[in-house]
Amino acid sequence: MSVKGWRYGMQLPVQTLTRTLADPWEDKATVSDLVTITKKAEATGHDFVGVCDHIAIPDNDYAANMTTTWYDTVATLSYLAAHTTTVNLLSVVWIAAYRHPLQ
């Protein structure tokens, strides 16, 4: 989706399952819903779909509204790539320090 040189995309809902950031339906959403949303973004001409990366949850008041379900960025993008053809897939945030470089 481009308008005068601008490219438009979206960050996937569902992926974080964080109650403070999510719509009420998202906590019941499945991986299949991620695929459905990504395919819809592709079909409607979005240039990209992004996912974010957090595998460590802060120990604060904000965390009380978060779940521990955060899909792995690389695995999520790989899975979505197998179900799409033209939409660009990107990591909005990817924290390399969360992962051991040799594992």
Model-predicted regions and their roles:
Residues 1-83:
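N-terminal beta1-alpha1-beta2 module of alpha/beta enzyme domains
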Residues 101-103:
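Catalytic cores of alpha/beta
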Residues 84-92:
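Conserved catalytic cysteine-centered active-site region
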Residues 96-99:
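Short, small-residue-enriched loops and turns at beta-alpha junctions
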